[in-house]
UniProtKB/Swiss-Prot annotation:
The gene is bioB. It holds the Pfam family Radical_SAM. Its EC number is 2.8.1.6. NCBIfam families: bioB. Keywords: 2Fe-2S, 4Fe-4S, Biotin biosynthesis, Iron, Iron-sulfur, Metal-binding, S-adenosyl-L-methionine, Transferase. This is Biotin synthase. [4Fe-4S] cluster binds at C70, C74, C77. It catalyses: (4R,5S)-dethiobiotin + (sulfur carrier)-SH + 2 reduced [2Fe-2S]-[ferredoxin] + 2 S-adenosyl-L-methionine = (sulfur carrier)-H + biotin + 2 5'-deoxyadenosine + 2 L-methionine + 2 oxidized [2Fe-2S]-[ferredoxin]. The keyword Thylakoid does not apply. It comes from Corynebacterium glutamicum (strain ATCC 13032 / DSM 20300 / JCM 1318 / BCRC 11384 / CCUG 27702 / LMG 3730 / NBRC 12168 / NCIMB 10025 / NRRL B-2784 / 534).
Length: 334
């Protein structure tokens, strides 16, 4: 039972009934809820998700067009060419991308996201991505999203014209903590790309990684900054420390804090798709993942991630079936 007068009581009126997200101060109260109130938080977040987003879960597969060799120094990422990590630079050709899209579609996924480890695309990458999107759309009934770094207006317009329906560019963390995570570019550069994406009519996808050493105040700050984007989708990653990176020795996020964060992000963004992404297997395990799917999450990446292993996609599909969570069906508008 929710205790009257608590932040959950406030959220029930403000978020569930009115669809208005919590502010930063209110989110701090959510992030510091006692452990015994986490089930109440999950229940409320699930009710908010059902009312404002519906009951369906969107499933997505991702693939890396270009892996490794990135010139940026994102401290969590093994794809940086500046760190002594085991990841090496690899390019995929278009036939392999089309085949991967076909395999993704067979799982029931409605979206296939093509990712490249770059600060921003050069002409070679832009051309290959445009050709890949056209090739995939000609053979596979699936939406194509992309994540290839910082873009200028011309590049944004080209991707929109090619048929990219959603663009991912994560803010990664709160503006105040960003300099502790990345030093080779700014938070503002990322924000500007997202502004251009929205202006071009593509759906905005932006999230980040929790558990990188940010304070609870910065976690609440991050949720509000994401909400200000009015994003279609927010991927929620949890730090999976990668060998050779500056964050290699960071501890995993506590599972209870992860659940509080999921609930808080749902209460900050009642209308937004919250997508389970990297690190959930280590941070939450099977039980925690099930709690989160009944506590505000309404989308998942299935299969492996960019440089880390996920769960077998069959296990995730079985989990959704066991929880009686319907998978979103792709609706084509003609």
């Amino acid at each position: 039972m929710t205790i009257p007068g608590t932040i959950l009581d406030t959220a029930r009126t403000q978020v569930l009934e009115q669809g208005i997200g919590l502010n930063q101060q209110q989110l701090m109260e959510v992030l510091t809820l006692p452990e015994e109130q986490i089930p109440d938080l999950m229940e409320l977040a699930h009710q908010v998700r059902l009312k404002w987003c519906g009951e369906e879960i969107e499933v997505e597969g991702i693939i890396s067009l270009k892996t490794g060799g990135c010139p940026e120094d994102c401290h969590f990422c093994s794809q940086s060419g500046l760190f002594e990590s085991p990841v090496r630079s690899v390019w995929l050709d278009i036939p392999n991308l089309v085949e991967a899209a076909k395999q993704t579609a067979k799982t029931g996924a409605t979206e296939f996201c093509i990712v490249a480890a770059v600060k921003g695309p050069d002409e070679r990458l832009m051309t290959q991505l445009e050709e890949a999107v056209l090739a995939i759309h000609s053979e596979v009934e699936i939406e194509v999203a992309a994540s290839i770094g910082t873009l200028n207006k011309e590049q944004v317009d080209r991707l929109a014209a090619a048929g990219v329906h959603r663009y991912n560019h994560n803010l990664e963390t709160a503006r105040s903590y960003f300099p502790e995570v990345v030093t080779t570019h700014t938070w503002e550069e990322r924000r500007e790309t997202l502004r251009l994406v929205a202006e071009a009519g593509m759906e905005v996808c932006s999230g980040g990684i929790l558990g990188m050493g940010e304070t609870l105040e910065q976690r609440a700050e991050f949720a509000v900054q994401l909400a200000e984007l009015d994003p279609h989708e927010v991927p929620m990653n949890f730090l999976d420390p990668r060998p050779g990176t500056p964050f290699a020795d960071r501890e995993l996020m506590d599972s209870r804090d992860a659940l509080r964060s999921i609930g808080a992000f749902r209460l900050a963004m009642p209308h937004t798709m919250l997508r389970f992404a990297g690190g959930r297997e280590l941070t939450l395990g099977d039980k925690g993942s099930e709690q989160a799917l009944l506590g505000g999450i309404n989308a998942m990446i299935v299969g492996n991630y960019l440089t880390t292993l996920g769960r077998p996609m069959e296990d995730d599909l079985d989990m959704m079936d066991r929880l009686q969570l319907p998978i979103k069906v792709l609706n084509k508008v003609i």
